[in-house]
Amino acid sequence: MSRPPPTGKMPGAPEAAAGDGAGAGRQRKLEALIRDPRSPINVESLLDGLNSLVLDLDFPALRKNKNIDNFLNRYEKIVKKIRGLQMKAEDYDVVKVIGRGAFGEVQLVRHKASQKVYAMKLLSKFEMIKRSDSAFFWEERDIMAFANSPWVVQLFCAFQDDRYLYMVMEYMPGGDLVNLMSNYDVPEKWAKFYTAEVVLALDAIHSMGLIHRDVKPDNMLLDKHGHLKLADFGTCMKMDETGMVHCDTAVGTPDYISPEVLKSQGGDGYYGRECDWWSVGVFLFEMLVGDTPFYADSLVGTYSKIMDHKNSLCFPEDTEISKHAKNLICAFLTDREVRLGRNGVEEIKSASFFKNDQWNWDNIRETAAPVVPELSSDIDSSNFDDIEDDKGDVETFPIPKAFVGNQLPFIGFTYFRENLLLSDSPPCRENDAIQTRKSEESQEIQKKLYALEEHLSSEVQAKEELEQKCKSINTRLEKTAKELEEEITFRKNVESTLRQLEREKALLQHKNAEYQRKADHEADKKRNLENDVNSLKDQLEDLKKRNQSSQISTEKVNQLQKQLDEANALLRTESDTAARLRKTQAESSKQIQQLESNNRDLQDKNCLLETAKLKLEKEFINLQSALESERRDRTHGSEIINDLQGRISGLEEDLKTGKTLLAKVELEKRQLQEKLTDLEKEKSNMEIDMTYQLKVIQQSLEQEEAEHKTTKARLADKNKIYESIEEAKSEAMKEMEKKLLEERSLKQKVENLLLEAEKRCSILDCDLKQSQQKLNELLKQKDVLNEDVRNLTLKIEQETQKRCLMQNDLKMQTQQVNTLKMSEKQIKQENNHLMEMKMNLEKQNAELRKERQDADGQMKELQDQLEAEQYFSTLYKTQVRELKEENEEKTKLCKELQQKKQDLQDERDSLAAQLEITLTKADSEQLARSIAEEQYSDLEKEKIMKELEIKEMMARHKQELTEKDATIASLEETNRTLTSDVANLANEKEELNNKLKDTQEQLSKLKDEEISAAAIKAQFEKQLLTERTLKTQAVNKLAEIMNRKEPVKRGSDTDVRRKEKENRKLHMELKSEREKLTQQMIKYQKELNEMQAQIAEESQIRIELQMTLDSKDSDIEQLRSQLQALHIGMDSSSIGSGPGDAEPDDGFPESRLEGWLSLPVRNNTKKFGWVKKYVIVSSKKILFYDSEQDKEQSNPYMVLDIDKLFHVRPVTQTDVYRADAKEIPRIFQILYANEGESKKEPEFPVEPVGEKSNYICHKGHEFIPTLYHFPTNCEACMKPLWHMFKPPPALECSRCHIKCHKDHMDKKEEIIAPCKVYYDISSAKNLLLLANSTEEQQKWVSRLVKKIPKKPPAPDPFARSSPRTSMKIQQNQSIRRPSRQLAPNKPS
């Protein structure tokens, strides 16, 4: 039966319903967008947008715009409320600062509510906008938020305020790998583990379609179990469809940057994920060696080494690195076309370096790490460095005069992993009371759950800690067992070496005794010579005495004359000085008088100013009293306003309560209406059911009555049976009547309910009318109050205008007071300045007197020193002669040794001739053997023919296999198309619900086809397996044929055996001859080594003597210069020169400069720092001493020739970017010639000089392309040459270190000056020096620049070492970091 339409609906109701359905669908889509955390318009983004708009518009200048002011009035309060409800920095307690960078810092924090520990990263909005790059943090936030990888540090939430962005991340208490490498000597086993984890972490990032571009140990953090996670994704970039990246700037850390990324600067950068694998190679090298492979103190040095990596990559000899590790490093540090990992991670995973028994690529994260951090608590930060508090003022955005939009770039940054906003399902249409109860119950349950979860997590943590301790104890036990075994083996080795050493000791003692005899013999000779010298000296003295007796009288006369002259000269000088002092005294007295007069004038002015000041102060007091009265009036007015505002707020609250009551009434009304409609529906349903049942009963009754009548007519005889039937019918009728009664009672109940609902509706209508009346009354009251408020605001505006006028007057008066104060200060300053002038003049007078006395004393001391130095110089000359004679004797010995060597070589040649004869015999034997081999080759030909036949069979077999493979491929393609069709049909199913039956039939058909295809595929796979087994059988058959030996004729076998015997005999003879030869060679080699050692010792002694001579020469030069200065002073004093004529240059004469400077230790300032040396610059040499004692003993550390100096200059940040920023203004660089240091033991390993393919030659320069991220200027056009993120392409000369734009070279501009340094790299050196202050650095540079020869020194082809860079031989120390065997629980 068709149901009648509802009475209250319009004719077009179905169309409206359809429209509502479409609208609901769009609303759901919109809701999905708002709920989706990855959507740009999610709830957090919308709230951020509103918040940032209010922050950017809430300024006085912008509020003048009426629209902006209205917007702020509307949303300002609600935005403040949102800020109060949202997460903020105050929700966390800061434990410690664990990191600081250019944009902010990382803090270790504890959440106040949950008591959980996190790492919170703060990024300054001002710094990011100031440096014109605010996009890098988006990639970092998105990766950490949506990665869901165990290899990436997780982001729990991100929020912001007006100053900072906050990222709350998981805390990694193990610190970074830089900390681990600084505390431990990393063995290869550990390096294998950490490299494998880095590879897996990078693979996870690459699988997201990103390239990291800044892989380094600083960005590798360790969790509490010691496993690795990657961090700092600010440099990440999205790959295109081909897996490549387009970038015009070189991004990354200089030591870890790849060549292709370096080449991208200023050009079309196009590279792939292989740039990350380069960084992995650098990281592995650093772990095993202790330094990066392309380390240099300057940026240009590192970049040039990276570009020339084929020549510059070398492994140090003092560190043991396995062949597999070297191969892997070389495979990573190659050109990108051949680099390992270019074709996928599986390439790297299959490397032999990673093979081990402890872990594999699938379970590495479940295995125990090499170092598990020992933590005292959940806030243990011992693996992080202590960072000083930043006491500097935090910079903020200035107040704008127009709209700037500083907050707009950060809209959408807010994120929560567990987003509670809009997380619940839409609210059910039930009573509010039930919902509140349910929510309260759910909150209580959640609290209990949370407490249980916390308890569980603590228990789990405790369990994990115990398991870790057990694991660590097991690993320690294993380590100790291994160490024990190693110690046993080491002990055995030591014992064997001890025996060898004892034998060598006995030999050395024997040699020592022989050398002692020789030394005694030499000593006797020396004593005899000394006796002869003494006798000669006695004779000389006798002769001198005779001569002196005749000359004494003349000398006395001369001495008296000299004394008279000296006394006269002294008298003259004293009279001159007395005259000078009188003049200066008169001048000073005049100056004092002038100053006194000036002082009086100033005092008078001061008195006048004080009177003016008093007047102004009185006026100021009067104004202040007026101001206070105004303030009182204002406060009274503000109190009235506050009262009115309170009344308004009360009325507004009443309004709100009225609105809420209205809303509740409307809600109840709706609910009742809904109930009414439901009841009506039920009633109509019930009526329909009842009518239907009645009709059915009536029909059954009519049928039964008809049957009854027929039965009465037919069967009158069987009354008894009929009576029983009637009884049954009557019972059925009774049951039916009961049912009818029940239905009627139900109907009455429904009607009663309807009446009650109608009564309630009428009551609610009455209530509604009453509330509307109340609302109207309240609105009228509100209008009256608004008029009062307007009147009061007008009054307030008038008062503010009056106040502004008063304030302007006050400002004028305060300005006048300030000007008077300023003039008073100036007068006081002038007075102080004049007083200081007076004091200085008095001091100068006293100093002049002291200088005169000191000069007299120095004259006497220098005379004594001169006499002593003359005596020493004669002694040194005699010593030099003796040394020269000894040197000549040693050269003779060397010649004799060379002759012996030639004799040995002649003997060796004769032995070689004998060897050739034996070899000819062997050749004749080989001829006979070749005949036998020819016969053997005939047999092999037959064998090859058979092999060819087998190959043809194999080729046919392969063809058949390829055909079958093609059919399988075609089937697989059909299978793919079928699966794609299934996916398409599934999508259509969702869109077209009406055609569901048709699509299901098609799907079932497709599934049948798919099953049949799978069956066909299975058949073909079986065929493939059978083909493979046949193939393996064929290969095995081939191997049998190949390995089968062919029968050889018996007649030729005996000849071969005979010849083999003869061959063996010859081999034995050859062996014996070779052994004899090697023994002789060893013997002669030992003698040669001993000779070379002696020569080296002698040359070292000669160098040291030469260095002492140089230092003595410089001392003599100093004394001569001092003498000359004294003579000049004497002459000038006799002539009567003024006191201000001769000006000393910093306390040193023009030719000499000395002081303390620092040199870099092992050319690595980052690791080993600087060492202090006392440096003296004479007219010819630069002498370096370890201490002043060495200087007194004439024992220099290093000597350089000034003639060979090329260039001296102060360094920039790019030259020594590893040095501390405070040290850079104190460092300068010396470039000098170095024509042969081969005979000297090198203190540092010499860096190999690579090809100059990457240099750009221009005007004598050797330019290297670079980028500057630090402040630097172009030395050609003086424009900025740097940028923090996108620097312009630049060039730097590797010789003179001039810096310029690359555009000058490209445009062929003539701005660039020629190179100041012309030298061959193989015969040149540079030296960095650190002065005590910037003033000293400037002094050293200016003085050394003057000493550089105008023409560059020509390299001497015959010179052995000019200049000498003679350094004392120091013990070879390892470059590795100091080892650490203790657990990693250390103070950072």
Curated annotation (Swiss-Prot):
Changing K121A: Loss of kinase activity. Pfam families: PH_MRCK (PF25346), Pkinase (PF00069), Rho_Binding (PF08912). It catalyses: L-seryl-[protein] + ATP = O-phospho-L-seryl-[protein] + ADP + H(+); L-threonyl-[protein] + ATP = O-phospho-L-threonyl-[protein] + ADP + H(+). It is a peripheral membrane protein. Residues 357-425 form the AGC-kinase C-terminal domain. Residues 497-573 form the REM-1 domain. Its cofactor is Mg(2+). The modification Phosphothreonine is found at T414, T1212. Highly expressed in brain, lung, liver, skeletal muscle, kidney and testis. Homodimer. Interacts with IRS1. Interacts with RAF1. Interacts with RHOA (activated by GTP), RHOB, RHOC. Interacts with PPP1R12A. Interacts with EP300. Interacts with CHORDC1. Interacts with BRCA2. Interacts with NPM1; this interaction enhances its activity. Interacts with SORL1. Interacts with PJVK. An interaction between Thr-414 and Asp-48 is essential for kinase activity and dimerization. This is Rho-associated protein kinase 2. The lineage of its organism: Eukaryota, Metazoa, Chordata, Craniata, Vertebrata.
